Amino acid sequence: MGRHGSRWSRPPCFRVLRLWTYAHRCDLGHTDPLSRRTEMTTTERPTTMCEAFQRTAVMDPDAVALRTPGGNQTMTWRDYAAQVRRVAAGLAGLGVRRGDTVSLMMANRIEFYPLDVGAQHVGATSFSVYNTLPAEQLTYVFDNAGTKVVICEQQYVDRVRASGVPIEHIVCVDGAPPARSR
């Protein structure tokens, strides 16, 4: 099926985000769903990955969710969920909606996971782009995917821009994107 003519009626996480936001009167950027622990039931099976993520974060918030090789960096489910909420709110603020595409282009780093899951929580499709691709191949990847937002490291911004694809937003995880050279 085509990029927007999907066979799915809604991306899996969209339903959960609406439920989470409206049913609990939760603002993505300001409310801690972990404080609603008693309202959630754990006897029902989650129906989406986003629901499973939120449920896990609520059930065992202090457990380690992510650990880098060697254990130099860790992230608890509480911190992971908080970062996912901030990312989802930020992407929503940029106008990212259900069906949009967010491309992630960075070296291996723990920040990748909240970015990826945060995009899914607003109903976007997120995917990782090989950071070794030349601009010509990025042109195909971004254009074919209909990329609206690229989240990357500063070192990749020039290559993203050189792709020539009209990307609405470039977000750098390690600072502001360098100004366009004229």
From Swiss-Prot:
Q: Which domain of life is it from?
A: Bacteria
Q: Which InterPro entries match?
A: AMP-dep_synth/lig_dom, ANL_N_sf, ATP-dep_AMP-bd_enzyme
Membrane-spanning residues where? none
**Species, as recorded:** Mycobacterium tuberculosis (strain CDC 1551 / Oshkosh)
Its recorded name reads Uncharacterized protein MT1599.1
Xref: PANTHER family: LONG-CHAIN-FATTY-ACID--COA LIGASE (PTHR43767), NONRIBOSOMAL PEPTIDE SYNTHASE PES1 (EUROFUNG)-RELATED (PTHR43767:SF1)
